[in-house]
Amino acid sequence: MALLQQRKQEIISGYQTHETDTGSADVQVAMLTERINKLSTHLQANSKDHSSRRGLLQMIGRRKRLLAYILKHNPERYRALITRLGIRG
């Protein structure tokens, strides 16, 4: 489930910390969240797609590690990010 280039640019511009930022933890978490949301809807319609389910779990694990890194280094930025993305209840 690849994201369209235009959607990627929208996400990057919305979460980047400076002009040329494309790979900060915030941007990575936002991109992973978008991919996770797309894959979740795919799996609701295709419940027997086990390879995609495995990929989803890997993406969730990667996002969890990135969020732990952000929380460790900048708790205020972490709280703002999860609120903005609408994750963590």
Swiss-Prot record:
Keywords, ordered alphabetically: Ribonucleoprotein, Ribosomal protein, RNA-binding, rRNA-binding
A single GO cellular-component term on record: cytosolic small ribosomal subunit
Gene3D superfamilies in the record: 6.10.250.3130, S15/NS1, RNA-binding
TM helices/strands, residue ranges: none
InterPro entries in the cross-refs: Ribosomal_uS15, Ribosomal_uS15_bac-type, uS15_NS1_RNA-bd_sf
Biological processes, Gene Ontology terms: translation
GO MF terms held by the record: rRNA binding; structural constituent of ribosome
Family: Belongs to the universal ribosomal protein uS15 family.
Subunit structure: Part of the 30S ribosomal subunit. Forms a bridge to the 50S subunit in the 70S ribosome, contacting the 23S rRNA.
Role noted for this protein: One of the primary rRNA binding proteins, it binds directly to 16S rRNA where it helps nucleate assembly of the platform of the 30S subunit by binding and bridging several RNA helices of the 16S rRNA.
Protein name: Small ribosomal subunit protein uS15
Organism: Cyanothece sp. (strain PCC 7425 / ATCC 29141)
Species lineage: Bacteria, Bacillati, Cyanobacteriota, Cyanophyceae, Gomontiellales
